[in-house]
């Protein structure tokens, strides 16, 4: 018995419905997979961007903290420098006052001859030369002439040799000098300053650390003195 057109049409419709259903299922499967991949990629991108944002803000926080530390360090250093400057200014004022009082020493007729003798002796003992040129203030010339024989005797006892001292009467020390002498030997190649000013500077360099301690107390960060 042959198949009627009606049956053929039914079979065709059935086959078409099956194909359409299968196609729809396949399309849904593709859509689902595509959506899943999209969500995975979206999640990855979101996480990546979140990580970048976190790293950005962490970097900014570190920069801000570093800047804060730098500013704090600068402020601390500036404070220390101001404190050190104030201390140095105070020490300088103490030494300036001592310098201004030097002129009073040479004006003390009772004390100055012994001091001047000591300065001459110190200079001669530093040089230990056979021939020495001595400069002094013009106002001290007569006193130096009086003291020199005794100084040379003392030098000979200490050194065991004699020294010829020539007084330079053409080039006196400045009148504003506080006092003392300058000595030279070997045509001026060797010079020794034995003035009150030079002795004060020498003493100042030696006692500045002690002056700092006396004025401001010991420095906990300092383990030695100059």
Swiss-Prot record:
It is a peripheral membrane protein. It is found in: Cytoplasm; Apical cell membrane. Signal peptide: none annotated. Keywords: Cell membrane, Cytoplasm, Ion transport, Membrane, Transport. Expressed in the excretory cell and syncytial hypodermal cells (at protein level). Expressed in the intestine (at protein level). One of its GO terms (molecular function) is proton-transporting ATPase activity, rotational mechanism. GO terms for cellular component: apical plasma membrane; cytoplasm; plasma membrane; proton-transporting two-sector ATPase complex, catalytic domain. Disruption phenotype: Larvae are arrested at the L1 stage. Larvae exhibit swollen vacuoles in the hypodermis of the head region, gradually spreading throughout the whole body. Pharyngeal pumping ceases at L2 larval stage with many vacuoles covering the entire body. Causes necrotic cell death in intestine and hypodermis. RNAi-mediated knockdown causes sterility, formation of endomitotic oocytes in the proximal gonads, and impaired ovulation. Diakinesis stage oocytes are displaced toward distal gonads. Impaired yolk uptake by the oocytes from the pseudoceolomic cavities. The keyword DNA repair does not apply. Subunit of the V1 complex of vacuolar(H+)-ATPase (V-ATPase), a multisubunit enzyme composed of a peripheral complex (V1) that hydrolyzes ATP and a membrane integral complex (V0) that translocates protons. V-ATPase is responsible for acidifying and maintaining the pH of intracellular compartments and in some cell types, is targeted to the plasma membrane, where it is responsible for acidifying the extracellular environment. Regulates pH homeostasis in the intestine. Probably by regulating cytoplasmic pH, required for cell survival in the intestine and hypodermis. Belongs to the V-ATPase E subunit family. V-ATPase is a heteromultimeric enzyme made up of two complexes: the ATP-hydrolytic V1 complex and the proton translocation V0 complex. The V1 complex consists of three catalytic AB heterodimers that form a heterohexamer, three peripheral stalks each consisting of EG heterodimers, one central rotor including subunits D and F, and the regulatory subunits C and H. The proton translocation complex V0 consists of the proton transport subunit a, a ring of proteolipid subunits c9c'', rotary subunit d, subunits e and f, and the accessory subunits vah-19/Ac45 and vah-20/PRR. This is V-type proton ATPase subunit E. It comes from Caenorhabditis elegans. The lineage of its organism: Eukaryota, Metazoa, Ecdysozoa, Nematoda, Chromadorea. The gene is vha-8.
């Amino acid at each position: 018995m042959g198949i009627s057109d009606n049956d053929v049409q039914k079979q065709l419709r059935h086959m078409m419905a099956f194909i359409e259903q299968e196609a729809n299922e396949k399309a849904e499967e593709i859509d689902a997979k595509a959506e899943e991949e999209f969500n995975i990629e979206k999640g990855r991108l979101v996480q990546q961007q979140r990580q970048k944002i976190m790293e950005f803000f962490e970097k900014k926080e570190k920069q801000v903290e570093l800047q804060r530390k730098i500013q704090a360090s600068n402020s601390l250093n500036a404070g220390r420098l101001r404190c050190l400057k104030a201390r140095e200014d105070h020490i300088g004022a103490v030494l300036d006052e001592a310098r201004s009082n030097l002129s009073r020493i040479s004006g003390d007729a009772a004390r100055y001859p012994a001091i001047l003798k000591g300065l001459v002796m110190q200079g001669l003992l530093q040089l230990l030369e056979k021939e020495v040129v001595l400069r002094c203030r013009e106002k001290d010339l007569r006193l130096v002439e009086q003291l020199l024989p005794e100084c040379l005797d003392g030098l000979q006892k200490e050194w065991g040799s004699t020294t010829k001292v020539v007084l330079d009467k053409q080039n006196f020390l400045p009148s504003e000098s506080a006092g003392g002498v300058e000595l030279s030997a070997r045509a001026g190649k060797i010079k020794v300053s034995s003035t009150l000013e030079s002795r004060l500077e020498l003493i100042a360099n030696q006692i500045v650390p002690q002056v700092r301690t006396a004025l401001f107390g010991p420095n906990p960060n300092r383990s030695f003195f100059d």
